[in-house]
Amino acid sequence: MSSTFGKIFSVTTWGESHGPAVGAVLDGCPAGLPITEEMIQAELNRRRPGQGKLTTPRNEKDTVKILSGVFEGKTTGTPISFVVFNEDQHSKDYADIAKWYRPGHADLCYDLKYGFRDYRGGGRSSARETIGRVAAGAVAKAFLKTVAGTEFLSWVSSVGTVDSTSINVSELTLDQIEASPVRCPDADASAKMEQAILEAKSKGDSIGGVVALLVKNVPAALGEPVFDRLDALLAQAMLSIPACKGFEIGSGFAAARMHGSEHNDEIYVEGNTYHTRTNNAGGSLGGISNGEPIYCRMAFKPTATISQLQKTAGRSYENGELAAKGRHDPCVAVRAPVIVESMAALVLADLYLQQKRNCLD
Protein backbone atom coordinates (compact mmCIF):
# COMPACT_ATOMS: atom_id res chain seq x y z
CA MET A 1 0.00 0.00 0.00
CA SER A 2 1.35 3.42 -0.95
CA SER A 3 0.82 6.02 1.77
CA THR A 4 3.61 8.48 0.88
CA PHE A 5 3.29 11.44 -1.50
CA GLY A 6 6.15 13.65 -2.71
CA LYS A 7 9.88 13.25 -3.33
CA ILE A 8 11.62 15.95 -1.26
CA PHE A 9 8.74 17.62 0.58
CA SER A 10 6.97 14.33 1.28
CA VAL A 11 4.08 13.30 3.50
CA THR A 12 3.17 9.86 4.81
CA THR A 13 -0.33 9.54 6.24
CA TRP A 14 -1.42 6.82 8.64
CA GLY A 15 -4.44 5.60 10.59
CA GLU A 16 -7.97 4.38 9.98
CA SER A 17 -11.42 5.90 10.41
CA HIS A 18 -12.30 3.85 13.50
CA GLY A 19 -8.81 3.26 14.84
CA PRO A 20 -7.46 5.14 17.86
CA ALA A 21 -5.97 7.99 15.81
CA VAL A 22 -5.00 9.33 12.40
CA GLY A 23 -2.03 11.47 11.46
CA ALA A 24 0.93 12.13 9.22
CA VAL A 25 4.69 12.47 9.09
CA LEU A 26 6.04 15.31 6.94
CA ASP A 27 9.64 15.07 5.79
CA GLY A 28 11.79 17.54 3.86
CA CYS A 29 10.44 20.81 5.25
CA PRO A 30 13.32 23.31 5.59
CA ALA A 31 14.25 24.52 9.06
CA GLY A 32 13.21 27.90 10.42
CA LEU A 33 9.61 28.03 9.14
CA PRO A 34 7.22 29.46 11.77
CA ILE A 35 4.57 26.82 12.52
CA THR A 36 2.07 26.50 15.37
CA GLU A 37 -0.64 24.00 16.24
CA GLU A 38 -3.12 26.87 15.98
CA MET A 39 -2.23 27.43 12.31
CA ILE A 40 -2.80 23.77 11.51
CA GLN A 41 -5.96 23.60 13.63
CA ALA A 42 -7.53 26.43 11.64
CA GLU A 43 -7.16 24.35 8.48
CA LEU A 44 -8.44 21.16 10.11
CA ASN A 45 -11.50 23.02 11.38
CA ARG A 46 -12.49 23.67 7.77
CA ARG A 47 -12.70 19.92 7.02
CA ARG A 48 -13.98 18.85 10.45
CA PRO A 49 -17.23 16.82 10.55
CA GLY A 50 -20.30 17.94 12.45
CA GLN A 51 -20.37 21.43 10.93
CA GLY A 52 -24.15 21.48 10.50
CA LYS A 53 -27.05 19.83 8.73
CA LEU A 54 -25.13 19.62 5.44
CA THR A 55 -22.33 17.42 6.81
CA THR A 56 -22.00 14.17 8.74
CA PRO A 57 -23.14 14.38 12.37
CA ARG A 58 -20.03 12.51 13.52
CA ASN A 59 -18.79 14.79 16.31
CA GLU A 60 -15.01 15.03 16.18
CA LYS A 61 -12.99 17.97 17.49
CA ASP A 62 -10.04 16.88 15.32
CA THR A 63 -7.59 18.50 17.75
CA VAL A 64 -4.08 18.29 16.33
CA LYS A 65 -0.92 17.66 18.31
CA ILE A 66 2.56 18.22 16.86
CA LEU A 67 4.81 15.46 18.18
CA SER A 68 8.13 16.33 16.54
CA GLY A 69 9.94 18.59 14.11
CA VAL A 70 8.92 21.93 15.64
CA PHE A 71 10.77 23.70 18.46
CA GLU A 72 9.96 27.11 19.90
CA GLY A 73 7.48 27.73 17.09
CA LYS A 74 9.82 26.93 14.17
CA THR A 75 10.52 23.84 12.10
CA THR A 76 13.81 22.13 12.89
CA GLY A 77 14.35 20.46 9.52
CA THR A 78 13.59 17.04 10.98
CA PRO A 79 10.41 15.02 10.31
CA ILE A 80 7.25 16.73 11.56
CA SER A 81 4.71 14.35 13.13
CA PHE A 82 1.03 15.16 13.61
CA VAL A 83 -1.60 13.16 15.46
CA VAL A 84 -5.38 13.57 15.79
CA PHE A 85 -7.20 11.15 18.08
CA ASN A 86 -10.55 9.71 17.00
CA GLU A 87 -13.20 10.30 19.67
CA ASP A 88 -16.65 9.56 18.22
CA GLN A 89 -16.45 6.20 16.47
CA HIS A 90 -19.69 4.22 16.25
CA SER A 91 -18.20 0.96 15.01
CA LYS A 92 -21.37 -1.00 15.81
CA ASP A 93 -23.05 0.78 12.88
CA TYR A 94 -20.83 -1.28 10.57
CA ALA A 95 -21.42 -4.76 12.00
CA ASP A 96 -23.76 -5.70 9.14
CA ILE A 97 -21.18 -4.93 6.46
CA ALA A 98 -18.52 -7.28 7.80
CA LYS A 99 -19.84 -9.81 5.28
CA TRP A 100 -21.55 -7.53 2.74
CA TYR A 101 -19.97 -5.18 0.21
CA ARG A 102 -21.39 -1.66 0.08
CA PRO A 103 -22.14 -0.49 -3.50
CA GLY A 104 -19.92 2.43 -4.48
CA HIS A 105 -17.40 1.78 -1.69
CA ALA A 106 -13.91 0.27 -1.78
CA ASP A 107 -14.99 -2.75 0.31
CA LEU A 108 -14.95 -5.28 -2.52
CA CYS A 109 -11.71 -4.01 -4.06
CA TYR A 110 -9.85 -4.05 -0.72
CA ASP A 111 -10.92 -7.66 -0.19
CA LEU A 112 -9.92 -8.60 -3.74
CA LYS A 113 -6.50 -6.99 -3.26
CA TYR A 114 -5.61 -7.90 0.33
CA GLY A 115 -8.00 -10.70 1.25
CA PHE A 116 -8.77 -8.79 4.43
CA ARG A 117 -10.19 -5.36 5.27
CA ASP A 118 -11.10 -3.06 8.13
CA TYR A 119 -14.82 -2.66 7.44
CA ARG A 120 -15.39 -0.08 10.20
CA GLY A 121 -16.11 3.19 8.42
CA GLY A 122 -14.08 2.13 5.40
CA GLY A 123 -10.83 1.85 7.34
CA ARG A 124 -7.95 3.28 5.34
CA SER A 125 -10.19 4.28 2.41
CA SER A 126 -12.21 6.63 4.63
CA ALA A 127 -12.00 10.37 4.08
CA ARG A 128 -10.69 10.67 7.65
CA GLU A 129 -7.34 9.72 6.15
CA THR A 130 -7.26 13.24 4.67
CA ILE A 131 -6.71 14.75 8.13
CA GLY A 132 -3.01 14.01 7.72
CA ARG A 133 -3.01 15.61 4.29
CA VAL A 134 -4.60 18.81 5.60
CA ALA A 135 -2.15 19.03 8.51
CA ALA A 136 0.83 18.61 6.17
CA GLY A 137 -0.80 20.90 3.63
CA ALA A 138 -1.01 23.67 6.22
CA VAL A 139 2.78 23.53 6.53
CA ALA A 140 3.17 23.47 2.75
CA LYS A 141 0.95 26.55 2.44
CA ALA A 142 2.97 28.40 5.07
CA PHE A 143 6.21 27.46 3.30
CA LEU A 144 4.99 28.65 -0.11
CA LYS A 145 3.53 31.83 1.37
CA THR A 146 6.93 32.59 2.92
CA VAL A 147 9.09 31.90 -0.13
CA ALA A 148 6.77 33.10 -2.91
CA GLY A 149 3.63 34.74 -1.51
CA THR A 150 1.55 31.88 -2.95
CA GLU A 151 -2.14 31.85 -2.02
CA PHE A 152 -4.73 29.08 -2.33
CA LEU A 153 -8.50 29.41 -2.72
CA SER A 154 -10.95 26.57 -3.32
CA TRP A 155 -14.73 26.60 -3.45
CA VAL A 156 -17.75 24.54 -4.53
CA SER A 157 -18.72 25.60 -8.04
CA SER A 158 -21.63 23.21 -8.54
CA VAL A 159 -23.80 20.70 -6.71
CA GLY A 160 -25.83 18.31 -8.81
CA THR A 161 -27.29 20.40 -11.64
CA VAL A 162 -26.89 23.71 -9.77
CA ASP A 163 -23.98 25.76 -11.15
CA SER A 164 -22.49 28.99 -9.80
CA THR A 165 -22.55 31.79 -12.36
CA SER A 166 -21.50 35.03 -10.67
CA ILE A 167 -18.12 34.49 -9.01
CA ASN A 168 -15.44 37.13 -9.59
CA VAL A 169 -12.33 35.06 -8.95
CA SER A 170 -10.04 38.10 -9.17
CA GLU A 171 -11.63 39.53 -6.01
CA LEU A 172 -12.53 36.28 -4.25
CA THR A 173 -11.56 35.84 -0.58
CA LEU A 174 -11.57 32.94 1.85
CA ASP A 175 -14.05 34.77 4.07
CA GLN A 176 -16.53 34.95 1.18
CA ILE A 177 -16.18 31.22 0.59
CA GLU A 178 -16.47 30.23 4.25
CA ALA A 179 -19.52 32.46 4.75
CA SER A 180 -21.54 30.04 2.61
CA PRO A 181 -22.80 26.81 4.24
CA VAL A 182 -21.85 24.96 1.04
CA ARG A 183 -18.65 26.98 0.47
CA CYS A 184 -19.98 28.60 -2.69
CA PRO A 185 -19.45 32.39 -2.78
CA ASP A 186 -22.34 32.85 -5.25
CA ALA A 187 -25.23 33.63 -2.88
CA ASP A 188 -28.03 32.62 -5.24
CA ALA A 189 -26.34 29.38 -6.25
CA SER A 190 -25.41 28.66 -2.63
CA ALA A 191 -29.05 28.70 -1.55
CA LYS A 192 -30.05 26.38 -4.39
CA MET A 193 -27.15 24.03 -3.65
CA GLU A 194 -28.17 23.83 0.00
CA GLN A 195 -31.71 22.99 -1.05
CA ALA A 196 -30.49 20.27 -3.43
CA ILE A 197 -28.35 18.68 -0.70
CA LEU A 198 -31.15 18.71 1.87
CA GLU A 199 -33.58 17.25 -0.66
CA ALA A 200 -31.20 14.37 -1.41
CA LYS A 201 -30.63 13.83 2.31
CA SER A 202 -34.37 13.70 3.02
CA LYS A 203 -34.68 10.83 0.53
CA GLY A 204 -31.85 8.85 2.11
CA ASP A 205 -29.72 9.74 -0.90
CA SER A 206 -26.62 11.81 -1.67
CA ILE A 207 -25.48 14.19 -4.40
CA GLY A 208 -22.23 15.05 -6.19
CA GLY A 209 -20.48 18.34 -6.82
CA VAL A 210 -17.59 20.15 -8.46
CA VAL A 211 -14.82 21.92 -6.53
CA ALA A 212 -12.72 24.66 -8.13
CA LEU A 213 -9.18 25.66 -7.18
CA LEU A 214 -7.30 28.91 -7.78
CA VAL A 215 -3.63 29.28 -6.84
CA LYS A 216 -2.16 32.79 -7.11
CA ASN A 217 1.47 33.94 -7.09
CA VAL A 218 2.79 30.64 -8.40
CA PRO A 219 6.53 30.71 -9.14
CA ALA A 220 7.35 30.04 -12.78
CA ALA A 221 9.36 26.98 -13.87
CA LEU A 222 7.83 24.43 -11.45
CA GLY A 223 7.29 20.97 -12.92
CA GLU A 224 9.56 18.11 -14.01
CA PRO A 225 8.91 16.90 -17.59
CA VAL A 226 8.12 14.46 -18.82
CA PHE A 227 6.45 12.21 -16.27
CA ASP A 228 6.36 14.58 -13.30
CA ARG A 229 4.65 17.39 -15.15
CA LEU A 230 2.92 19.95 -12.95
CA ASP A 231 -0.52 19.19 -14.37
CA ALA A 232 0.07 15.43 -14.14
CA LEU A 233 1.07 15.66 -10.47
CA LEU A 234 -1.91 17.88 -9.70
CA ALA A 235 -4.18 15.33 -11.36
CA GLN A 236 -2.61 12.52 -9.33
CA ALA A 237 -2.94 14.52 -6.13
CA MET A 238 -6.59 15.41 -6.70
CA LEU A 239 -7.68 11.99 -7.91
CA SER A 240 -6.10 10.45 -4.80
CA ILE A 241 -8.69 12.29 -2.67
CA PRO A 242 -11.54 9.93 -1.73
CA ALA A 243 -14.60 10.40 -4.00
CA CYS A 244 -12.76 12.57 -6.56
CA LYS A 245 -13.58 11.16 -10.00
CA GLY A 246 -12.56 13.88 -12.45
CA PHE A 247 -9.91 16.55 -13.00
CA GLU A 248 -9.41 19.35 -15.51
CA ILE A 249 -6.98 22.25 -15.65
CA GLY A 250 -7.48 25.56 -17.43
CA SER A 251 -10.14 25.25 -20.11
CA GLY A 252 -10.00 21.48 -19.62
CA PHE A 253 -12.49 19.49 -21.65
CA ALA A 254 -13.82 22.68 -23.21
CA ALA A 255 -10.52 22.88 -25.12
CA ALA A 256 -11.70 19.98 -27.26
CA ARG A 257 -14.39 22.27 -28.70
CA MET A 258 -12.03 25.18 -29.41
CA HIS A 259 -9.69 26.19 -32.22
CA GLY A 260 -6.03 26.92 -31.60
CA SER A 261 -6.67 30.58 -32.36
CA GLU A 262 -9.11 30.61 -29.43
CA HIS A 263 -7.20 28.45 -27.00
CA ASN A 264 -3.66 29.81 -27.33
CA ASP A 265 -2.86 32.31 -24.57
CA GLU A 266 -1.11 35.30 -26.14
CA ILE A 267 2.11 36.30 -24.36
CA TYR A 268 3.24 39.80 -23.44
CA VAL A 269 6.02 41.22 -21.32
CA GLU A 270 5.70 43.79 -18.54
CA GLY A 271 9.02 44.99 -17.17
CA ASN A 272 11.03 41.79 -16.96
CA THR A 273 8.07 39.48 -16.35
CA TYR A 274 6.12 37.47 -18.91
CA HIS A 275 2.33 37.22 -18.74
CA THR A 276 -0.51 35.83 -20.84
CA ARG A 277 -3.65 37.75 -21.80
CA THR A 278 -5.87 34.73 -21.15
CA ASN A 279 -5.37 31.61 -19.07
CA ASN A 280 -6.76 28.66 -21.01
CA ALA A 281 -3.63 26.72 -20.03
CA GLY A 282 -4.53 27.07 -16.36
CA GLY A 283 -1.01 28.12 -15.39
CA SER A 284 0.83 25.13 -16.88
CA LEU A 285 2.45 24.65 -20.31
CA GLY A 286 4.55 21.63 -21.17
CA GLY A 287 4.03 20.50 -17.60
CA ILE A 288 5.82 23.60 -16.25
CA SER A 289 4.25 26.54 -14.43
CA ASN A 290 4.30 29.76 -16.48
CA GLY A 291 3.72 32.13 -13.55
CA GLU A 292 0.01 32.61 -14.22
CA PRO A 293 -2.57 31.46 -11.66
CA ILE A 294 -3.27 27.74 -11.55
CA TYR A 295 -6.94 27.04 -12.13
CA CYS A 296 -8.44 23.57 -12.05
CA ARG A 297 -11.72 21.82 -11.29
CA MET A 298 -12.41 18.50 -9.61
CA ALA A 299 -15.55 16.36 -9.84
CA PHE A 300 -16.67 14.61 -6.66
CA LYS A 301 -19.10 11.73 -6.87
CA PRO A 302 -22.15 11.45 -4.61
CA THR A 303 -21.35 9.96 -1.21
CA ALA A 304 -21.41 6.19 -1.65
CA THR A 305 -23.16 5.50 1.67
CA ILE A 306 -26.91 6.01 1.38
CA SER A 307 -29.73 4.64 3.51
CA GLN A 308 -31.77 3.41 0.55
CA LEU A 309 -31.97 -0.35 0.07
CA GLN A 310 -29.55 -1.53 -2.64
CA LYS A 311 -28.74 -4.89 -4.16
CA THR A 312 -25.26 -6.21 -3.41
CA ALA A 313 -23.20 -9.34 -2.82
CA GLY A 314 -21.32 -10.79 0.13
CA ARG A 315 -17.97 -12.36 0.98
CA SER A 316 -19.51 -15.84 0.77
CA TYR A 317 -20.51 -15.28 -2.86
CA GLU A 318 -24.20 -14.79 -2.08
CA ASN A 319 -26.49 -12.06 -3.39
CA GLY A 320 -28.50 -9.88 -1.05
CA GLU A 321 -29.66 -6.39 -0.16
CA LEU A 322 -28.16 -3.72 2.08
CA ALA A 323 -29.30 -0.38 3.46
CA ALA A 324 -26.15 1.23 4.81
CA LYS A 325 -26.01 2.59 8.34
CA GLY A 326 -23.63 5.10 9.87
CA ARG A 327 -23.16 8.87 9.79
CA HIS A 328 -22.18 10.33 6.45
CA ASP A 329 -22.07 13.53 4.43
CA PRO A 330 -24.94 13.96 1.96
CA CYS A 331 -22.47 15.85 -0.28
CA VAL A 332 -18.74 15.31 0.20
CA ALA A 333 -17.86 18.27 -2.04
CA VAL A 334 -18.86 20.70 0.74
CA ARG A 335 -15.90 19.64 2.93
CA ALA A 336 -13.45 19.06 0.09
CA PRO A 337 -12.06 22.59 -0.64
CA VAL A 338 -9.43 22.61 2.12
CA ILE A 339 -8.33 19.09 1.11
CA VAL A 340 -7.97 20.25 -2.49
CA GLU A 341 -5.91 23.25 -1.38
CA SER A 342 -3.72 21.04 0.79
CA MET A 343 -2.92 18.57 -1.97
CA ALA A 344 -2.10 21.40 -4.39
CA ALA A 345 0.21 22.95 -1.78
CA LEU A 346 2.00 19.64 -1.25
CA VAL A 347 2.58 19.31 -5.00
CA LEU A 348 3.91 22.85 -5.36
CA ALA A 349 6.11 22.75 -2.26
CA ASP A 350 7.75 19.56 -3.50
CA LEU A 351 8.26 20.94 -7.01
CA TYR A 352 9.64 24.19 -5.60
CA LEU A 353 12.35 22.31 -3.71
CA GLN A 354 13.05 20.12 -6.74
CA GLN A 355 13.55 23.26 -8.83
CA LYS A 356 15.97 24.66 -6.24
CA ARG A 357 17.88 21.38 -6.39
CA ASN A 358 18.03 21.52 -10.20
CA CYS A 359 19.25 25.10 -10.63
CA LEU A 360 21.95 27.21 -8.97
CA ASP A 361 19.72 30.29 -9.09
Language-model features, listed with the residues they occupy:
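Short acidic, glycine/tyrosine-flanked loop/strand segments centered on an H-E-D-like triad
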Residues: A98-G123, K311-H328
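Glycine-rich, N-terminal phosphate-binding loop and its surrounding beta-alpha-beta segment
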Residues: E43-P103, D107
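Alpha-helical support elements that line or immediately flank enzyme active sites
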Residues: P20-G32, R128-T150, S154, D228-Q236, ...
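N-terminal, positively charged regions that mediate nucleic acid binding
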Residues: M1-R58
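A short glycine/serine-rich beta->alpha loop
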Residues: S10-T13, D118-E129, A220-E224, N279-S284, ...
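Glycine-rich, mobile lid/loop segments that gate access to catalytic sites or pores
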Residues: L112-V226
